[in-house]
């Protein structure tokens, strides 16, 4: 599949243009950028399924080529995702999906909770349910406010939350949602059996 560099106001990334009407803005985790191999593979899979995908760098990564995001800048990162969705709305006429990996998935879900009409669906890869070893510090306060359909993809060996913890946390979401478990995979989803068609199929079911 092919992609091309993309730039708009506050948005930097790569566009995977497809023939369908639906679109996706896809972003990375705290330690990476939009060139992460997993994001490239996910973008290619959805492009092949007819979805135009924008792989984008969050504002913190646009400012610094390495290092984690600062908590004080999280609102700026959400603003960057809002800008990415707006840019994609100019390119596609169909449904919009906001997707992210780890930190990116958390910011995507928080933005969707703040702005319920922003996107039709969320795809949240390796949502960081809590810091490793600290299950009391759940990051689910905004879950009851989610109104977009949501696909959660979680590794069975993810230290940021067990499958049981994730399943329990999702019970407070009233919007349609689905949890896909990748057996044997950790937080980076690199291990285990990971068929990308599971993602395209899961999102299609949610949006049907």
Residue spans of the language-model regions?
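Acidic catalytic loop of the alpha/beta-hydrolase fold
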Residues: 156-161, 188
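Short alpha-helix in the alpha/beta-hydrolase fold that links the catalytic acid
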Residues: 39, 139, 148, 162-170
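Catalytic histidine-centered segment of alpha/beta-hydrolase-like enzymes
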Residues: 185-196
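Core-facing hydrophobic residues within beta-strands of well-ordered domains
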Residues: 119, 176-177
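Primarily recognizes the serine-hydrolase "nucleophile elbow" in alpha/beta-hydrolase
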Residues: 81-148
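Short beta-strand/loop motif that positions the catalytic acidic residue
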Residues: 145-147, 152-154, 158
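Serine-hydrolase catalytic machinery in alpha/beta-hydrolase-like enzymes
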Residues: 5-95, 192
């Amino acid at each position: 599949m092919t992609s091309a560099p993309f730039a708009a106001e506050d948005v930097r990334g790569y566009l995977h243009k497809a023939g369908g009407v639906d679109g996706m803005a896809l972003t990375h985790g705290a330690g990476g950028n939009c060139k992460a191999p997993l994001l490239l593979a996910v973008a290619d899979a959805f492009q092949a399924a007819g979805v135009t995908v924008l792989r984008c760098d969050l504002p913190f990564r646009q400012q610094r080529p390495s290092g984690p995001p600062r908590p004080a800048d999280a609102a700026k990162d959400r603003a960057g995702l809002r800008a990415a969705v707006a840019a994609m709305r100019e390119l596609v006429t169909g449904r919009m999906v906001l997707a992210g990996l780890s930190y990116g998935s958390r910011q995507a879900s928080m933005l969707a909770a703040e702005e319920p009409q922003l996107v039709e669906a969320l795809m949240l890869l390796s949502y960081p349910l809590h810091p490793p070893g600290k299950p009391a510090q759940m990051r689910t306060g905004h879950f009851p406010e989610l109104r977009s359909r949501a696909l959660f993809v979680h590794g069975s060996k993810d230290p940021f939350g067990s499958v049981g913890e994730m399943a329990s946390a999702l019970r407070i979401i009233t919007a349609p949602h689905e949890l896909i478990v990748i057996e044997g995979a950790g937080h980076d989803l690199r291990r285990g059996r990971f068929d990308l068609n599971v993602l395209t199929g899961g999102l299609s079911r949610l949006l049907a």
